[in-house]
Amino acid sequence: MSRAAGHRPGLSAGQLAAATASPLLSLLLLLACCADACKGVPISPQRLQPEQELQLWNEIHEACASFLSIDSRPQASVALRELCRIVMEISQKPQEQSEKDNTKRFLFHYSKTQKLGNSNVVSSVVHPLLQLVPQLHERRMKRFKAEYQSPSVGQSKGYFLFRPRNGKRSTSFI
């Protein structure tokens, strides 16, 4: 087969390289998009440490950002640009996921119960501000008892604990 038969007429060397790379890049793009969904993708027995994974994502993100910022490459294929855009979107998802994990961890910490020693007493871990609720209740009850035991209190005063039900505030409540 002659050399001229394998050469497309009217294409420069750069255009020929881009044209032959386009199907390969399309295949890479397809594999990158479907890698997590495929059951047959080999998984490394040694997973990356979180620091290594974060460093890898940062390097990929920087490489794609620099590639997309350079507009002087007209021979770069559309598929490669799309691949970089997808990688940049994926690199932002782990940060969002870690924020969700922190929120879940916070909520779990304040909703879980723990057993103390060998006793059967179960105490719940509460938010520090919620620990003030019993003190506020004690203050209210002391104020109510002081108001109720004063000599000027009439019979109708004990019917409402803190304020009338129609929403009007009494002068002694303020």
Curated annotation (Swiss-Prot):
Chain positions with Methionine sulfoxide modification: M141
GO molecular function term, any single one: type 2 neuromedin U receptor binding
Family matches, as InterPro entries: Neuromedin-U_amidation-site (IPR018070), NMU (IPR042384), NMU_C (IPR008200)
BP-aspect Gene Ontology terms: eating behavior; energy homeostasis; gastric acid secretion; negative regulation of eating behavior; negative regulation of gastric acid secretion; negative regulation of gastric emptying; neuropeptide signaling pathway; photoperiodism
Signal sequence interval, chain numbering: 1-37
Residue stretch(es) of the prosequence: 38-105, 170-174
Pfam families linked to this entry: NMU (PF02070)
Record's keyword terms, sorted: Amidation, Cleavage on pair of basic residues, Neuropeptide, Oxidation, Secreted, Signal
Positions of modified residues (Asparagine amide): N166
UniProt-annotated location(s): Secreted
Keyword Secreted in annotation: yes
GO cellular component, one term: terminal bouton
Predominant place of localization: secreted
Function as written in the Swiss-Prot or TrEMBL entry: Stimulates muscle contractions of specific regions of the gastrointestinal tract.
UniProt similarity note: Belongs to the NmU family.
The protein, known as: Neuromedin-U
Annotated organism of origin: Mus musculus
